[in-house]
């Protein structure tokens, strides 16, 4: 057969192998239309260490400890190390491989086989020493796309590790603020209890003096019982929150006693350009997007499998049946073996693999959009809750101011002998009740502010670095 016929035959086989190749794989575009109708503000994005604005060194130490010792952080760091190792493997697969092989075999050749006597029926030593070289040519980008997919998984795991650290910080801050508010509520309930006891004693004196009927004591005593129950419930809730905090920071309960102090103020507001910027400010969105890109790269790997695989193998060394002449020049052997693999009759399996990769890409894109909708919902929910708490506290401030003015007039009337102590005690109890209600809405406001910070990403921002070492990233995240 002439040379040109060989070329025609080779071209025909090549085209046959590629005839069933699929179309191009496109990475789904970022869809930010659902963020366009988010309300805009004039604030800034949270800083990386937003909890430092609380000016509480003890709280900051607890956050660092929780991020360092939380099992979830260790799991996320291990997954990042696993992904980093996978990217190193994908990178290594793109290079050539060189191996040195050596073997010595003592063998008796059969006298009745293809080697006749006098060699047949005798023992001989077979020595082999060779350097082997192998390289796969990446003409269709299969290895490149596999590396990109592995790097995409590294990015996703990196974002998840950073997001886990931010999530733990938000949990510790929320628990700590709830403890602070609850401690103030307990102090307030104890003061109300003293007022209620004074009111009961006054009522008992009036009943004893015949100024009031005996049945008027029942409501006062009932109010005192309810107040005592509320105090016990608040103390039990405080103990439970302390246990929750212990689970995060891994310290003895004796070291977690929260002393009353002025409550901090978080003034996180909605930033400007909220819509599109939100995509780069949340770790879960960044991780989901990285997985979409990785899935697209894996689909391209499956697509490249439809094309011929070209590789080159070479070897050089010594081979001899006599060990005494093993490394003689006459025992040298070498060779070059270019090879091509044409997937002509494998289209069914390749197509199934490609369809599976495409389905994984669709699933990853749907998961990304689901995370995006959840992020939008969390931002809106935090806005509504913060606004509702602020409105409630504003109304309570008006009611408390009115009650305080009325209380001042009652005290003046009492000093002038125009009123008794019962009216003053009732007013003080009313003021205490309003303050307690304000404490409740203060807690809701603080938790809504923390939720707002968390919904806005907790200080996370996408970096341009495509990959980083797992262990280095683990140490960096733990040191935050």
Task: Locate predicted features.
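Membrane-embedded segments
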Residues: 78, 82-85
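Terminal intrinsically disordered/low-complexity segments used for targeting and assembly
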Residues: 2-68, 151, 235-280, 322, ...
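Hydrophobic, well-ordered secondary-structure elements that form the walls
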Residues: 312, 340, 357, 364, ...
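Hydrophobic membrane-targeting signal helices
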Residues: 14-17, 195, 340-341
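Small/polar-residue-enriched beta-strand and adjacent coil segments characteristic
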Residues: 49, 55, 62, 77, ...
């Amino acid at each position: 057969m002439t040379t040109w016929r060989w070329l025609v035959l080779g071209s025909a086989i090549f085209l046959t192998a590629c005839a069933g190749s699929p179309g191009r794989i496109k990475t789904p575009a970022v869809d930010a239309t659902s963020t366009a109708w988010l309300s805009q503000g004039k604030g800034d994005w949270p800083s990386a260490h937003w909890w430092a604005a609380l000016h509480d060194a003890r709280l900051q130490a607890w956050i660092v400890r929780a991020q360092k010792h939380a099992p979830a952080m260790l799991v996320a760091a291990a997954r990042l190390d696993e992904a980093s190792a996978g990217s190193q493997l994908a990178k290594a697969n793109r290079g050539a491989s060189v191996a040195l092989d050596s073997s010595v075999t003592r063998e008796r050749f059969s006298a009745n086989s293809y080697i006749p006597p006098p060699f047949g029926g005798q023992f001989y030593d077979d020595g082999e020493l060779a350097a082997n070289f192998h390289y796969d040519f990446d003409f269709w980008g299969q290895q490149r796309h596999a590396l990109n997919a592995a790097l995409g998984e590294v990015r996703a795991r990196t974002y998840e590790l950073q997001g886990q650290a931010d999530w733990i910080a938000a949990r510790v801050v929320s628990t700590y603020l709830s403890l602070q508010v609850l401690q103030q509520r307990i102090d307030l309930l104890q003061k109300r209890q003293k007022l209620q006891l004074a009111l009961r004693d006054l009522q008992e004196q009036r009943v004893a003096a015949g100024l009031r009927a005996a049945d008027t004591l029942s409501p006062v005593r009932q109010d005192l019982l309810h107040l005592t129950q509320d105090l016990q419930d608040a103390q039990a809730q405080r103990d439970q929150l302390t246990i929750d905090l212990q689970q995060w920071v891994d310290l003895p309960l004796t070291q977690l006693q929260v002393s009353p102090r002025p409550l901090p103020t978080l003034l996180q507001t909605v930033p400007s350009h909220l819509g599109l910027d939100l995509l780069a400010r949340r770790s879960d969105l960044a991780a989901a997007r990285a997985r979409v890109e990785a899935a697209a790269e894996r689909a391209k790997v499956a697509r490249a499998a439809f094309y011929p695989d070209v590789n080159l193998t070479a070897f050089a060394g010594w081979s001899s049946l006599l060990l005494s002449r093993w490394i003689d020049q006459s025992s040298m052997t070498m060779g070059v073996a270019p090879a091509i693999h044409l997937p002509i009759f494998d289209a069914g399996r390749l197509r199934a693999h490609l369809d599976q990769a495409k389905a994984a890409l669709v699933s990853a894109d749907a998961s990304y959009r689901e995370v995006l909708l959840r992020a939008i919902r969390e931002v809106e929910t935090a806005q509504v809750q913060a606004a509702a708490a602020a409105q409630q506290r504003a109304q309570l401030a008006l009611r408390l101011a009115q009650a305080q003015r009325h209380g001042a007039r009652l005290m003046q009337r009492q000093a002038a002998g125009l009123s008794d102590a019962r009216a003053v005690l009732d007013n003080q109890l009313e003021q205490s009740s309003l303050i307690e209600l304000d404490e409740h809405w203060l807690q809701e406001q603080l938790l809504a502010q923390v939720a707002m910070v968390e919904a806005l990403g907790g200080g996370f921002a996408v970096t341009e670095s495509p990959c980083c070492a797992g262990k280095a990233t683990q140490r960096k995240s733990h040191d935050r």
